[in-house]
Amino acid sequence: MKKLVSLLLTLCLLLSLASFAAADVPADWQPFAERVKITVPVYDRSKVGYPPVDDNYWTRWIQENFGEKYNIDVQYVAIPRGDVMTKYSMLIAAQETPTILMEYDYPKVAQWANDGAMTEINLDEFKAVAPTFYQAMVDNKQLGYTDINGKTYFVLTERPYYDTTFTYATFVRMDWLRKVGYDHVPANYAETVDAMNKIIEAGLTTQPLGLGIPTSAYITNFGFRDFPVDEKEWAMHSSLGTPGFPWYPTQRMLKRTNAEYHMGWYSKEFDLEKDSRGAATDQTQTDFINGLTYSYGGYIANNMPWLNAFYENNPDAELAIANPWGGLEEGVNTGAIRADNPFGMIVGFSSLATPDQLKAAWMLMEWMIQPENLFVLENGIEGETYKLGEDGLPVMLEYEGEHMLNHNNNIDMTCLVHASKKVGTVEQTIAQMSPAGLPQDFTQMLIDNYYILRDIADKGLAYSDPVFAVAIESESEYSATLLSLYQEYYAKLVKCDPAEFDGLFEQFSQEFLDAGYQEIMDERLEAYEAGNTTKLPVAE
């Protein structure tokens, strides 16, 4: 009986997908009379064991099933995940701007628009070619993000459950916690301090936490901000593109890290390493794999090579998921988190693109958003890369052959449609993406983690950065220099004598302001006061 129900569910699913696609793909699509070439960026995460991101079975599958049908050459361009702006700058300077330009961070796409690398678009024309994609933007209330400086440049993809960030999780050594008397993961900062110091005292490791120099401008200081945060200060400082260094939450965050350093939590040579926070392989990941550190975080996927490597090196270890409230400390950290933007990729189009190339790019987006195409790209081939469960939903299988999906179920290709895979309910989505083939099943822990994050969001403690409807030109001019300064100051402030911390922070803050940050603050505040930015969410 269960098999019959499963079969019926599957048939209904596939029939509904087919009818949806037939109804929604524009009937007037015809092959181009002459061959049209489009170039599409795809993140290269340099992950060992994965096929090349720009030439693999699935890039060829898109060419065969979409490109050949409409006389379009679809060529993928590898973009190093850890150095996005440098690669794009090189392509733009060489007059090789990809037909599609896309990024998760608004300041980056704003810079491309401001620098003339992107073309203006007409949303009515886009809607005529890509009606399903356009309607998804309407349904997700994203049309307000398509313009900058009063001109339309962007279309936006979906980000499911954007205010919970559940697709990223930090794994911790539960076996170490048990050895020092804990039957749970620390649920506030007092417990975290107690646990880390006991782990050191017990000789389980010498430096329990990994640390390196930040590789991105984003400062993880949301929890260290007052709640509610002052909206003007938020508009001036909260950014993924420029470090909000001379601001009190950054001071609080770094003062805590300084105290942790002097408690012996970090290597004294941490400043020789980079910390990519799970975006790429670095020493912090290697140390965790080798059983030297307590925790490491990354994006959740069925196949997580660093977790596989960890268990190979530590077969008797027990892991758990870190509690999102683990940094909570009255007067210091509220537990607030950065919510993702209410959109995934911000997608623009090259100013060098011809009208046919623009249309071909829009056709690719419309074709990919059709459920039957998206299903194949995210799941692969039944019996090899996935099987159907009793509920009729795909269950990913361990597979490393020719048809292997790339990072996180091909997300760096399907991000042209949405930021993460979504299947049924949130519980089903998590179960479907939970790491497979490990000694432990993390599905329930990840579901529990989602509901803790949901609680944080429901309390109003999850919000994102402001999005500006005008270009902040000073950011384009100074951001690279300011990131370099932040990296320098970070190392010095973490290592300095605690008695010298406040004086050094004040000195470095003034230097940071003088190096261009004051201009950025002024320009962002002017845009905010002119009504050219989003506002903080209003508590319900």
Where are each of the predicted segments found?
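Bacterial N-terminal signal peptides
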Residues: 8-16
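Extracytoplasmic/secretory soluble proteins
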Residues: 13, 21-540
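Positively charged n-region of N-terminal signal peptides that target proteins for export
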Residues: 1-9
